[in-house]
């Protein structure tokens, strides 16, 4: 809780950031887990698999779909660089959803590295890719023309914008077409493996689909990402992805996480 008034002024004058607040509210379960793993790795099994459920808080202005407090459920695997980690987490997530009564849902899957490689090949500079991805992620909401307009407003290269628009206008954006622009074929192979295996495990109970525009808003995701959408709900009911860099800040270990199922 941030101090106010004279107490805040006095705290600022100390030059010590720790004096600015009396306590904090937990934002998520992911960062604390990363710290715990880094401090206790030698005592833990490998890979390390965790399930957590607890309250978390956001500095949000309350509105539909935006809450200041909610219950977050995390399922994490740390220390597994293989795509089998993604397969397992998607399988556990979907079985949990089926067990609590969800039906007719779709698991949408993408890999940020493939998307970034495609965009860079079209002429977008590396330092603008995060911004481009955020706009591209809105494809299902604002459409191709909306994406083109927003990228133009950001004053990005006109030739790159036209290249992306032409690619979208060509029809269904397939994984093979996107992968052809990716510098590392192994990344596309891993994504194909996850899609095929997840579809086999679905056994017709739900759909599994490649979603080329899926990015997910959290900046810490580094590779494969996925979201579960359901016709009865306007937003995703579950989602997650690989976040190697976050754990790497504490210890050079790769990790994948299903980050939230809100209840």
Regions of interest found by a model, annotated:
Residues 105-107:
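A short amphipathic beta-strand at an alpha->beta junction
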Residues 116-126, 219-226:
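Short glycine/threonine-rich loop-to-helix capping motif typified by GTGT followed
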Residues 11, 15-20, 28-44, 49-103, ...:
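Positively charged, Gly/Ser-enriched RNA/tRNA-binding surfaces
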Residues 8:
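Anionic ligand-binding catalytic core segments
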Residues 1-5:
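Short, structured active-site "lid" loops
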Residues 67-73, 109-117:
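Short, conserved phosphate-binding/catalytic loop or strand-edge motifs used
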Residues 94-98, 113-121:
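Hydrophobic mid-domain F-helix/FG-region of cytochrome P450s
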Residues 124-143:
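Acidic, His- and aromatic-enriched active-site or binding-groove loops in soluble protein domains
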């Amino acid at each position: 809780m941030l101090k106010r008034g004279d107490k805040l002024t006095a705290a600022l004058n100390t030059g010590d950031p720790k004096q600015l607040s009396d306590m904090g509210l937990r934002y998520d379960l992911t960062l604390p887990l990363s710290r715990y793993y880094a401090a206790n790795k030698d005592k833990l099994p490998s890979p390390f698999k965790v399930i957590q459920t607890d309250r978390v808080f956001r500095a949000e202005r309350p509105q539909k779909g935006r809450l200041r407090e909610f219950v977050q459920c995390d399922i994490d695997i740390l220390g597994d660089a293989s795509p089998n980690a993604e397969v397992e987490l998607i399988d556990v997530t979907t079985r949990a959803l089926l067990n609590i009564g969800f039906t007719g849902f779709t698991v949408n899957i993408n890999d940020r590295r493939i998307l970034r490689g495609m965009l860079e090949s079209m002429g977008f500079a590396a330092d603008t890719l995060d911004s481009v991805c955020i706009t591209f992620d809105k494809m299902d909401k604002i459409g191709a023309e909306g994406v083109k307009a927003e990228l133009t407003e950001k004053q990005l290269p006109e030739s790159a914008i036209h290249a992306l628009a032409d690619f979208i206008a060509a029809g269904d954006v397939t994984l093979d077409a996107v992968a052809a622009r990716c510098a590392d074929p192994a990344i596309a192979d891993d994504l194909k493996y996850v899609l095929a295996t997840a579809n086999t495990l679905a056994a017709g109970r739900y759909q599994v689909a490649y979603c080329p525009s899926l990015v997910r808003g959290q900046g810490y995701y580094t590779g494969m990402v996925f979201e579960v959408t359901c016709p009865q709900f306007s937003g995703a009911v579950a989602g997650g992805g690989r976040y190697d860099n976050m754990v790497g800040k504490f210890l050079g270990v790769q990790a994948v996480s299903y980050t939230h199922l809100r209840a």
